[in-house]
Amino acid sequence: RRHTRCLSDWSSDVCSSDLEALRQALREEMARDQNVYVIGEEVGRFEGSYKVTQGLFKEFGPKRVREAPIAEEGFMGIGVGSAMLGLRPVVEIMTLNFVLVAIDMVVNHAAKVRYMFGGKLKVPMVIRTPGGSGKQLTAQHSQSFEGWFANVPGMKVVAPSTPADAKGLLKAAIRDDDPVLFLENLTIYNLRGDVPEGDYVVPIGLAAVPRVGTDLTIVSHSYGTVR
């Protein structure tokens, strides 16, 4: 849908990094819907480990950018419960590896609530988390579990590969009425590309086709599409 390099001089788009596109999506959705809030470790005054939430605490205050202790299962549960009550939490987990600490809340609660209550309750929450390998991090910080979660009924998994998709898919995930695992990749956080201004939303489940051919189909996601 969008190039992984900037062509903004010839278009109405804005040249942004993946990080900036994510931040723009969060800011726009929080301004658009008072029910959207962010919760996670160091997301407030420290502005997040990778600065995705930079400026949001100052703009929206502590009620909508909520600091959490190092207790992933606890604040994941807060996200699930508040989503069931009508809010739209964006839960930031510092690394995908730490989602395992809260896996009971994700798999047995967030993903199952709609089925357990016959469709009468929904869990409109987003779990934002970076992952990927090749960054010379520890063994517990270098794993990719998206395949696990893609097999969980009721859970949607999103893995953008360009800044435009980062913005458009995050906005779509926040508006979705089911839980979405939004997987970011550390390697492409600083990747720059053209990002449409305004209310740009990319539908979840619609694959981007960067190159059309006739003989072979290669399917990939996240960093694998830009290597």
Residue ranges and their predicted role:
Residues 1-14:
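Single conserved hydrophobic/aromatic residue that forms the stacking wall/gate
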Residues 5-6, 156, 218:
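Short, flexible active-site loop motifs that bind/organize anionic cofactors or intermediates
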Residues 9, 150, 210-211:
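Short, flexible turn/loop "capping" segments at secondary-structure junctions
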Residues 12-179, 183, 187:
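Thiamine diphosphate
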